Design a protein with these regions (language model features):
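Carbohydrate-active catalytic/glycan-binding domains of CAZyme proteins
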Residues: 1-265
């Protein structure tokens, strides 16, 4: 399909620099784009923002800015610091918002948080910490959990995320919860001890991560992710843009029902 520009970044102020990680979602009869952006005068003041389209076709409809994602009235923490990579999912008639946000002084840590949504652009509940970079493979270069994505299957919710710096060490982890559990209770989620997808030197695929899930024309699940084709990067990998979009078919484990992430697919 032909690319269509639906919005342009501001020339100054908020939403004027580092426009990152857009996701398109359909909620309550309208289209929404969730993205992160910075400020030309403070380029690392990355915060989450929302665009809305009330027309049936998001390619031709008019988009309006809903501004910065709103936190719950009792929440004094969410979106105060570097926040990005938001995704949205529905379960049992409720919508949930998951995002990455940094905490700490000096060497900062990027955690994943979840909140129930009151509207498509405001949270209903105070944020809940889902996962922090606990393991060594989540702490290479930087201590990072980011890029959440959700897929449902057979009564289970699978939440993938990306970890470590964005070079060859970048990889995917996963959390799992029962769809009937309290998704705002961290105890409902089980975290995989090891990455579910990582660098495969034999295939020349390095640092896979920040994936999303969609379906092909026949309704089969497909994962879209980015990865590098070179192992070595000069300088800080954060400033190296050479990451490529890739596709992977998703199969399901016959015993556990969990998604299988395999380069063979």
């Amino acid at each position: 399909a032909e690319e269509v520009t639906v919005w342009e970044k501001h020339k100054e102020g908020i939403m004027s620099e580092h426009i990152w990680a857009p996701e398109l979602h359909y909620l309550d009869g309208k289209w929404y784009i969730y993205f992160a952006g910075g400020d030309k005068d403070d380029i690392w003041a990355i915060r989450p923002y929302v665009l809305e389209c009330a027309d049936a076709d998001p390619l031709t409809g008019a988009w309006t800015e809903k501004g910065k994602m709103g936190r719950a009235d009792a929440d004094e923490f969410s979106f105060e610091a570097f926040s990005l990579d938001a995704t949205v999912f529905e379960n049992k008639g409720k919508h949930y918002y998951v995002w990455a946000e940094k905490v700490g002084v000096g060497k900062q840590i990027s955690n994943l948080y979840i909140g129930e949504m009151e509207t498509p652009y405001k949270l209903k509940t105070v944020q809940v910490l889902l996962t922090s970079p606990d393991y060594d493979w989540e702490r290479v270069g930087f201590w990072v959990n980011e890029g959440p994505a959700v897929i449902h299957h057979d009564g289970r919710i699978y939440l993938t995320y990306s970890a470590s710096e964005t070079g060859a060490a970048y990889c995917m982890g996963m959390l799992t919860a029962d769809e009937d559990s309290d998704l705002l209770d961290p105890k409902s989620w089980t975290k995989e001890r090891y990455p579910v997808l990582r660098t495969d030197d034999s295939r020349g695929i390095y640092g896979p991560g920040h994936n999303s899930f969609t379906e092909d024309e026949e309704g089969n699940p497909v994962m879209v992710y980015h990865a590098r084709t070179e192992a070595e990067i000069e300088g800080n990998p954060l400033y190296n843009p050479n990451r490529h979009a890739m596709l992977m078919k998703i199969r399901w484990d016959e015993k556990t029902g969990a998604p299988i992430f395999s380069y063979e697919d």
